[in-house]
């Protein structure tokens, strides 16, 4: 694989978190202090391409090729937000946390769109809102996705009419919180699905830093999600004082 191809893979993976946050799930909740608004916000602006903060080596696996990439803004203007159907649409577009994983092709290989679709269906994902795949709560699709899966190639969707021609260096999985179940339970649904898809596609599971997902990182994510659940659980009811 050429250096240019590896650079492109790194750029796409680095920018995908922002793609998912804006393209798939709307806008994050506003902080209590609000945010600073630039003068030119809301106006047409010049396209800004991702940049590379360090050089890539000529060898290494998918994780190593993605090292050293600095996340930057991708242009999503003009994308159709109504693609696909309503299956997997979040009831509320606000979110406050995203947990992501990737399945990347091994060095010198790509993931074929047709294979991705077959494996997604085998692992219980359904095609729906935004033309991407979702894991839904069984019997309650109206509650929205437990997690979603998209291609890292812009715009992230799967064009079923041309799926046989589609190739992508990686696919991304997003657990967007709050979810229709506890954060930890949602993670326990997503992780084995990602691992199984990686096995069937002969790919590599990467974490949100584009490193190979290991036990220590999994344990750390579980701890983070336990803390999130504690923070967002309903406060206990106080007992009425005896008179």
Swiss-Prot record:
Topological domains on the Periplasmic side lie at 1-4
Q: Which example biological process does GO assign this protein?
A: FtsZ-dependent cytokinesis
The residue ranges for the Cytoplasmic side of the membrane come to 26-243
Source organism, top-level taxon: Bacteria
SMART domains hit by this protein: ZipA_C
Protein location: Cell inner membrane
- Mind telling me which Pfam families this protein's record contains? ZipA_C (PF04354)
Q: What is its main location?
A: membrane
Q: Which UniProt keywords apply?
A: Cell cycle, Cell division, Cell inner membrane, Cell membrane, Membrane, Transmembrane, Transmembrane helix
- Which intervals carry biased composition (Basic and acidic residues)? 35-50
Task: Region Disordered: list its residue ranges.
Answer: 30-89
* One Gene Ontology term, aspect cellular component: plasma membrane
Its record classes its membrane topology as: Single-pass type I membrane protein
- Listed transmembrane segments: 5-25
Subunit structure, interactors included: Interacts with FtsZ via their C-terminal domains.
What family does the entry list?
Belongs to the ZipA family.
Family annotation (PANTHER family): CELL DIVISION PROTEIN ZIPA (PTHR38685:SF1)
Function (record text): Essential cell division protein that stabilizes the FtsZ protofilaments by cross-linking them and that serves as a cytoplasmic membrane anchor for the Z ring. Also required for the recruitment to the septal ring of downstream cell division proteins.
Please give the name of this protein.
Cell division protein ZipA
